[in-house]
Amino acid sequence: MSAIESVLHERRQFAPPAAVEKAAAISGMAAYRALAEEAERDYEGFWARLARETLEWRKPFGKALDETNAPFYKWFDDGELNASYNCLDRHVAAGLGERIAVIFEADDGTVARVTYADLLARVSRFANALKKRGIGRGDRVVIYIPMSVEGIVAMQACARIGATHSVVFGGFSSKSLHERIVDVGATALVTADEQMRGGKTLPLKSIADEALAMGGCDAVKTVVVYRRTGGNVDWHAGRDVWMHEIVANESDACEPEWVGAEHPLFILYTSGSTGKPKGVQHSTAGYLLWVAQTMKWTFDWKPDDVFWCTADIGWVTGHSYITYGPLAVGATQVVFEGVPTYPNAGRFWKMIGDHKVSVFYTAPTAIRSLIKAAEADEHVHPKSYDLSSLRIIGTVGEPINPEAWIWYHKNVGQERCPIVDTWWQTETGGHMITPLPGATPTVPGSCTLPLPGIMAAVVDETGQDVPNGQGGILVVKRPWPAMARTIWGDPERFKKSYFPDELGGRLYLAGDGTVRDKETGYFTIMGRIDDVLNVSGHRLGTMEIESALVSHELVAEAAVVGRPDDTTGEAVVAFVVLKRSRPEGEEAAALAKTLRDWVGKEIGPIAKPKDIRFGDNLPKTRSGKIMRRLLRSLAKGEAITQDTSTLENPAILEQLAEVR
């Protein structure tokens, strides 16, 4: 099979700001290279040093890495620790009990502050309450809860008693929740009466009741309900209990359950190509080490920072950079219940000013939607807010188009904040390829270089390295501590999905088409391998075509998919959102031609979309991710048969289906 072609060439480069570089933990490229070389010289010794420096161990480990049952690797296997202790107790013991752990802002703007001492007490009370209901080490607890302090408390309490949590995003349907409860074999469920988002309520408890009524959930003996709104709920006596009632008389102290380094901390479900969700299982020590270390490296965390990751705890970003990473280093962080556009599209920028956020981490999808709003109304433009507290800004979830990167850099970072464009996955646990704010010169659209200790490479379909400048498949050549350990209950699927025989069985397959720059060696993600289009024998990454479209002055957002074509094999279909109102009729046809010509100029005639459809927005999940599988069906003219329960804006499907 021919190589994936990289056809979009970005040459703009931005050096780390002098003030950031001077104060950074990793200052300058020489410091970065020294760490990377240490890892290459003594791989196990490098990771062992970090693990001893970063975590507190009840029982020290001996050997760092056990490769005897590859690809089911073990790290620090004979050591013992507790994740909750490392996130809470050790900071309180160090005299930081009065440091603010969480600044929680509710959907309606109400703000609450929780200290480390408060959070430890709340976690301990809930942990004691769970233990009294027979929940403990080895049990699985499903958490279906809104963005809240209570959500963090529930996760940390599970870790404290050795139970393995599985958080399900609050936007999932009863069917999706049911599948996960059954697959993981949960003995308890933690939920809420209702969820508040954008001024609207979502009845979580009734959705949970529907899921439990579908059968196969007999192991669930306890349903803990957090009272968020006070809305009416059905009640199952003996099974259902109020969170505030069961913790009321519990002790503020709960001895941590000391567990082995490989003890499953959590199982997080991610969608699979076969339709059955994959329960990605993460360890305790290796995972916690890496989310703490990347807080220090990627975000250059300082004790006086106010950190804000806008993700939901239902996704891995919320696990790693809300519930565990920030707390593991003793950070003060903002946790937000709502959405970026309520009550208006200036909400993020107002909150940055209100809470003096210094490190801000959000998704390219959110940035692109806020660009459109800012272009239409200067009152919600970042320039109308005080963003002077910011020093580092980041992106997560998908590659960021170069033009969106430039807007973010100019208008949010005020051309003085480095952007950390982070590449990683649910399965990797934490950041893998990313700029370091005080070391790496950044290039719009590129995640730049792997972190020290991460042996990333670009290979062909046989696992052989490809030359820089030639597109290929992103892999990681050596195991790392935070990697997923297995797919819950399906180790063969784990091997087949991530360590396929076609690549020799020892390379971690990331599933992303990637190219390295000929000169810098920087990595640029070109899109999922599944999203590579074969147009007249040319294999094109969708990301580059989307970036070309978004670079046009009229375009706010674009998503590109393929559909079968008798002439070219596959045709490029683009779904486009403009910075102004959606065009129709002749105006739409003329603008489609303009954009086709634009892509031809930016990339080449081969990449021109055959079909361009304009929408008021794109189909997205409640977490802001574009649902490309739905766009593929629309492009082919097929009926939508997939689960759309997480779709934020169902009406857009009809609009995009009508447009031809």
Curated annotation (Swiss-Prot):
Organism: Burkholderia thailandensis (strain ATCC 700388 / DSM 13276 / CCUG 48851 / CIP 106301 / E264)
Family annotation (NCBIfam families): Ac_CoA_lig_AcsA, PRK00174.1
Positions with a binding annotation for CoA: R197, G198, G199, K200, T317, S536
One cellular component (GO) term of this entry: cytosol
Function, in words: Catalyzes the conversion of acetate into acetyl-CoA (AcCoA), an essential intermediate at the junction of anabolic and catabolic pathways. AcsA undergoes a two-step reaction. In the first half reaction, AcsA combines acetate with ATP to form acetyl-adenylate (AcAMP) intermediate. In the second half reaction, it can then transfer the acetyl group from AcAMP to the sulfhydryl group of CoA, forming the product AcCoA.
Record-level Gene Ontology MF annotations: acetate-CoA ligase activity; AMP binding; ATP binding; metal ion binding
Binding site for Mg(2+): V550, H552, V555
Family, per entry: Belongs to the ATP-dependent AMP-binding enzyme family.
InterPro entries documented for this protein: Ac_CoA_lig (IPR011904), ACAS_N (IPR032387), AMP-bd_C (IPR025110), AMP-bd_C_sf (IPR045851), AMP-binding_CS (IPR020845), AMP-dep_synth/lig_dom (IPR000873), ANL_N_sf (IPR042099)
Binding site for ATP: G397, E398, P399, D421, T422, W423, W424, Q425, T426, D512, R528, R539
Protein name as it appears in the record: Acetyl-coenzyme A synthetase
Keywords: Acetylation, ATP-binding, Ligase, Magnesium, Metal-binding, Nucleotide-binding
PROSITE patterns xref list: AMP_BINDING
